[in-house]
Amino acid sequence: MRQAAPPAARMRMDAKVISKAKLPSRHVTVGPARAPHRSYLYAMGLSAAEIAQPLVGVASCWNEAAPCNISLMRQAQVVKKGVAAANGTPREFCTITVTDGIAMGHQGMKSSLVSREVIADSVELTMRGHCYDALVGLAGCDKSLPGMMMAMVRLNVPSIFIYGGSILPGSYRGRQITVQDVFEAVGQHSVGTIGDAELLEIEQAACPSAGSCGAQFTANTMATVAEAIGLALPYSCGAPAPYEMRDRFNFASGEKIMELIAKNIRPRDIITLKALENAATVVSATGGSTNAALHLPAIAHEAGIKFDLFDVARIFEKTPYIADLKPGGKYVAKDMFEAGGIPLLMKTLLDHGYLHGDCLTVTGRTLAENMEHVAWNEHQDVVRPANRPITQTGGVVGLKGNLAPEGAIVKVAGMTELKFSGPARCFDSEEECFEAVTQRNYREGEVLVIRYEGPRGGPGMREMLSTTAALYGQGMGGKVALITDGRFSGATRGFCIGHVGPEAAVGGPIGLIRDGDVISIDAVNGTIEVALSDSELAARAKTWKARTTDYQSGAIWKYAQTVGSARDGAVTHPGGAKETHCYADI
């Protein structure tokens, strides 16, 4: 026979009871008709008191594919303790993730962006199916961060995001290195600059711990976004994965989620147009990944807010570049955390008018209130004051022109030349271009065009890090340009333009250009043009024929049927604007 809840459990419940009258979990825990449902919960060792408490989903992207996510399950246990300490009942589950570092440079990368949607969808379905009342989501690698945040906004139950933390930098012959150095070493190896032994030494030194790629690549960019947009507790996204102090943030997040339930503070109270502008600001200020221009519109879409690539680019235009972070700069995420963390960056941006201070956050306070006690650290040079930036305009720039009517994006952090013009050399897949690069079958001054790699045409909008890193390793990173309707890794550097839209697969201009057409890129004025008249482009469009891909079934085929333009975030469903009811209000 089941025993009544012990006195200690009853005392915890009596301390602060949250009514389930309007919470989703009432559908599985309250009333005689739910006796079978409660029976399942008893089977897992829950007490009557625990069943009567709010049920909090604790979702992680844990797997053994890569170091990015390997610590998430351990961290989730601490979150659960925080939930329980605050009179909630945590229910842990995992979702999938595809790690770009493993998927890079081959067909596996077609799964990467697709996984963002699968993560959001799977978290939604798990929460819906079990009627959980709130969500604490832990994520590590690139697409898992936006995927988890998209799920939070879509479900609109009280939610807190936790980043698993960055990897520690490796050490190679007295200097810090990251996985970016390994990719570039492959290019050096291909031209004989380094030998097999040195390549092996670099690959074995670059990644010494658990955690996501250590520089301001996509994962750390989106982690910075999570704090700036208000979904993560201050400082929580900066502490590296191996640091035991992460448990303070994990426990606090578990406690705080119960406060958000009590106050009914939801993600769509936090994710406003102003909050999205704050997120775009920190991306540009840190020279962050161009992938943010894909993920921010997707997060906005879940809230029913129109915030596309051009809106992101508008913020980029007026934001100073102030964080000296790799790949364009000198430092890694660990260095910024030890200098003062993401709040140090946000404080100087706020003080100089670049952030909206009145945005609500998961602390229950506004961004400005969170920053009240953040003091400037004069004894560091990782983050510059916003009035004394590295460059006056942001580290990422939006482009538009007859080659990209729906826009394109380029990271200019660390670049000295912001204009480029040259003849096109066209490739219809990344593999074709990578082979040409490794064989040195290209010329200085050319614009390498990789097309049919967009969201629909790839399918999956692959990243091109293997190709760009090989160019850099060959010493050609600043001597050629590369444009694509696909994406670039946050680790990419050089004159590399991604997200060109419309993509080739739907008849966009990038699919019409030919070898030798002169392409001009101007990252100062934000233009990208091909020297062809409108009539010539129209004539070529008449002879263009759509292509089929190798994916005629399965998850990637299904993705290609529904995915939209990169301009709007490459989303696959109508979004919050078309919603007729919200899960949180079932």
From Swiss-Prot:
Catalytic residues identified in the record: S489 (proton acceptor)
Entry keywords, A to Z: 2Fe-2S, Amino-acid biosynthesis, Branched-chain amino acid biosynthesis, Iron, Iron-sulfur, Lyase, Magnesium, Metal-binding
Highest taxon listed in the record's lineage: Bacteria
Entry keyword Metal-binding: yes
Enzyme Commission identifier(s): 4.2.1.9
SUPFAM superfamilies: IlvD/EDD N-terminal domain-like, LeuD/IlvD-like
Residues annotated to bind Mg(2+): D100, D142, K143, E463
Modified residues (N6-carboxylysine): K143
Keyword Cell membrane listed: no
Enzyme category, top tier: lyase
Cofactor: [2Fe-2S] cluster; Mg(2+)
Binding locations of [2Fe-2S] cluster: C68, C141, C213
Catalytic activity line of the entry: (2R)-2,3-dihydroxy-3-methylbutanoate = 3-methyl-2-oxobutanoate + H2O; (2R,3R)-2,3-dihydroxy-3-methylpentanoate = (S)-3-methyl-2-oxopentanoate + H2O
Annotated GO MF terms: 2 iron, 2 sulfur cluster binding; dihydroxy-acid dehydratase activity; magnesium ion binding
Classification via PANTHER family: DIHYDROXY-ACID DEHYDRATASE DAD, DIHYDROXY-ACID DEHYDRATASE, MITOCHONDRIAL
Family: Belongs to the IlvD/Edd family.
Assembly, per entry: Homodimer.
Protein name (Swiss-Prot/TrEMBL): Dihydroxy-acid dehydratase 2
Species of origin: Mesorhizobium japonicum (strain LMG 29417 / CECT 9101 / MAFF 303099) (Mesorhizobium loti (strain MAFF 303099))
Lineage start: Bacteria, Pseudomonadati, Pseudomonadota, Alphaproteobacteria, Hyphomicrobiales
Gene: ilvD2
